[in-house]
From Swiss-Prot:
Residues 1-42 have a biased composition (Low complexity). In conjunction with KorA, inhibits the transcription of the kilA, trfA and korAB operons. Is also involved in the negative control of the kilB operon. GO terms for molecular function: DNA binding; identical protein binding. The gene is korB. It comes from Escherichia coli. It holds the Pfam family KorB_C. One of its GO terms (cellular component) is protein-containing complex. The lineage of its organism: Bacteria, Pseudomonadati, Pseudomonadota, Gammaproteobacteria, Enterobacterales. This is Transcriptional repressor protein KorB. Signal peptide: none annotated.
Amino acid sequence: MTAAQAKTTKKNTAAAAQEAAGAAQPSGLGLDSIGDLSSLLDAPAASQGGSGPIELDLDLIDEDPHQPRTADNPGFSPESIAEIGATIKERGVKSPISVRENQEQPGRYIINHGARRYRGSKWAGKKSIPAFIDNDYNEADQVIENLQRNELTPREIADFIGRELAKGKKKGDIAKEIGKSPAFITQHVTLLDLPEKIADAFNTGRVRDVTVVNELVTAFKKRPEEVEAWLDDDTQEITRGTVKLLREFLDEKGRDPNTVDAFNGQTDAERDAEAGDGQDGEDGDQDGKDAKEKGAKEPDPDKLKKAIVQVEHDERPARLILNRRPPAEGYAWLKYEDDGQEFEANLADVKLVALIEG
């Protein structure tokens, strides 16, 4: 080795040593504390700030076995999932789902809401889905979410209310929890214990309107045989209009003959007597007049023949039902003026409007 070659080798060795020493020293930029960046490549990608959605492997996600929507919910039908799946396949999931950590199986997640998007993603052959992690989530939150999207059937709502009542919660507390009126809760509670014929009509889809079901139950309590016979007619359409006519017919049929009619001011007995008088000829007319003259009394102008208490509930006009015993102190039965629905309500939610003569 010549002197020049030895000098060059020594310089290269020194440069290499200096480079190694420099690599071992902190950069001064704080980057040395990061470690191996390759270890981050396999972690879920979160948005800046750590509060945005992450991309979760679908195989790590489970549906909530206690979610309010049941297997026969229309949104879970094969056609519905295929429809949303086709959209996801073409455009992806635009709105992240919400999940919480599975406390029983660390590393896995349970869906809070977004089961249809989850199923649609699997249908579309996706491997992952954008998701928010929200561990502060309960069944009431799921119900609220689905109520706002109109994705719960009346039966699913009723089943949730039934579970909450079984826990010892009061109807008023449940109403506040899900942002609904007490009347809404009462109407759906009725679905939990329907008479057999009405239950059949509801479960088979002949009637889906909760208000109509409640109207049928009210009529059934008064005239069960007539309501059952009415429902036995499979060609009978069940709507608010037809049920209202049914109730009017049953009420008229079972009305006390001494009830004063609000339109003509006569009792049914007086009306029938007048009709009979007209058929009996002159003698009958005279006898009727004599009987009326003997029993006639001057009406007291300070007394109401029939008092009607007009109120307002949920910004809808209603009236108090004075001849029905309330379920508890502070409650009363009301009847809406627009559709004739009868229901029990907390008097704290009722506004007195007027007292008139019927």
